[in-house]
């Protein structure tokens, strides 16, 4: 069988290296090198998977977890780790079960996959743009910038539309549509959130907060919450908690939605009030602006002082109980109105893509067109941050590779 795989990213490279040698595999990549998006994954360290059991893994898939069940059980994170290690890549498991190459270099992951596909006899065609895919009878014609390729099967592994500079420009959606596949509108997922009060976030830009509780309040009701780390940006908020939250709110109307940060989640209102009171006793002769240094990061103090409504030069010993309670409320509810999610180009992954109702979950073959497959981010599946999205790419690639090897 002659097989063309379109896209030399994570799923395309792994599928190429896994399809049995009885087939002729041609991997077509529009960039000058393979794995361009992999290269920047995990800030250049490449979080290859999450070392957890399939059941726990599926709890971290935000969109279409049920569809992924067969593939995740069929090729687990343990299998990914074994494959990479057998091919010479040493791995290390870090906090939150996140798995990285020991070298901390994403380039080593790309090298490992490149070696595996060369060992498998795959023909790689770089700098080759696929313009269209058509089918006549049982034969596919893949029209490229370097001429047509005829083949028996096509695997679309073109990714989503996030980080377009890496080549993810939504080409796969075009190919899917040409075969009458439905595309679920692509949206940003795992992305920063932009807020209305950018005058405040600009002042706090670069400030990272650890161990905070971040909630999303919509029409007065809490709809999602995350505990952990976050960072302020010129336009709003980002960091691990925010990225996870973005995956949960990218399908809702963001009018009347706010981000609420509990700066002291370990303390109840009463406990925090006692803590503030004891600090005020300790600094009783100081001005208010100089009395919060034990409680808050230096960069945050001027903002909290201003928003508290207490004059900065007020002596601490004359601050009323009511003003103190307002301050405690602010520390437990440091709120920002949501303006929008960051544009899809800035998102870590794309939510949306080829509708899973039209794909066989066991093989990732199109239910509409025989021998046409869709794997990786081009499919409407996405997960939280922590190596889950790459595992989706690996598992879907292997499901297709096994089907094509039969």
Predicted region positions:
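A conserved FAD-binding loop/helix module that cradles the flavin
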Residues: 162-175, 179, 381-406
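Glycine-rich loop(s) and the adjacent beta-strand/alpha-helix scaffold that form part
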Residues: 153-199
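N-terminal Rossmann-like FAD-binding beta1-loop-alpha1 element of flavoenzymes
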Residues: 2-27, 400-405
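Short hydrophobic core segments
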Residues: 4-6, 28, 130, 149-165, ...
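Conserved N-terminal/central alpha/beta ligand/cofactor-binding core
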Residues: 30-123
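A glycine-rich dinucleotide-binding beta-alpha-beta segment and adjacent secondary-structure elements
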Residues: 126, 132, 302-382
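Conserved beta-strand-loop-beta-strand element in the redox core of flavoprotein oxidoreductases
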Residues: 132-149, 154, 219
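An anion/pyrophosphate-binding glycine-rich loop and adjacent beta-alpha core
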Residues: 32-34, 40, 54-55, 182-185, ...
């Amino acid at each position: 069988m002659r097989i063309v795989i379109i896209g030399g990213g994570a799923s395309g490279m792994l599928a190429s290296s896994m399809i049995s040698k009885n087939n002729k595999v041609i991997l077509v990549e529009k960039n000058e090198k393979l794995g361009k998006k992999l290269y920047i994954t995990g800030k250049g360290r490449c979080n290859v998977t999450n070392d957890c059991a399939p059941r726990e893994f599926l709890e971290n898939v935000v969109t279409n977890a049920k569809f992924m069940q067969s593939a995740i059980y069929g090729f687990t994170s343990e299998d990914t780790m074994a494959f990479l290690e057998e091919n010479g890549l040493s791995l290390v498991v870090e906090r939150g079960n996140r798995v990285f190459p020991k070298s901390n270099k994403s380039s080593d992951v790309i090298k490992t996959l490149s070696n595996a596909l060369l060992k498998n006899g795959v023909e790689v065609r770089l700098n080759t743009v696929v313009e269209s895919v058509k089918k006549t009878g049982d034969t596919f014609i893949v029209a490229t910038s370097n001429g047509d390729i005829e083949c028996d099967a096509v695997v679309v592994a073109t990714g989503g539309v996030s980080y377009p500079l890496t080549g993810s420009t939504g080409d796969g959606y075009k190919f899917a549509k040409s075969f009458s596949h439905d595309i679920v509108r692509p949206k940003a997922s795992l992305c920063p959130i932009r807020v209305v009060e950018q005058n405040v976030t600009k002042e706090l830009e670069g400030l990272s907060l650890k161990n905070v509780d971040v909630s999303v309040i919509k029409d007065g009701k809490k709809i999602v919450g995350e505990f952990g780390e976050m960072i302020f940006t010129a336009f709003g908020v980002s960091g691990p908690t925010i990225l996870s939250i973005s995956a949960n709110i990218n399908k809702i109307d963001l009018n009347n939605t706010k981000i609420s940060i509990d700066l002291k989640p370990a303390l109840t209102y009463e406990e925090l009030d006692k803590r503030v009171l004891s600090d005020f006793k300790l600094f009783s002769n100081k001005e208010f602006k100089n009395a919060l240094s034990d409680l808050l990061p230096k960069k945050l103090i001027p903002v909290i002082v201003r928003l508290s409504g207490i004059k900065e030069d007020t002596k601490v010993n004359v601050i009323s109980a009511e003003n103190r309670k307002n301050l405690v409320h602010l520390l437990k509810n440091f709120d920002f109105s949501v303006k929008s999610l960051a544009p899809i180009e800035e998102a870590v992954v794309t939510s949306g893509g080829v509708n899973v109702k039209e794909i066989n979950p066991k093989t990732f073959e199109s239910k509409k067109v025989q021998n046409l497959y869709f794997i990786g981010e081009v499919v409407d599946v996405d997960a939280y941050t922590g190596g889950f999205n790459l595992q989706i790419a690996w598992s879907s690639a292997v499901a297709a590779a096994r089907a094509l090897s039969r």
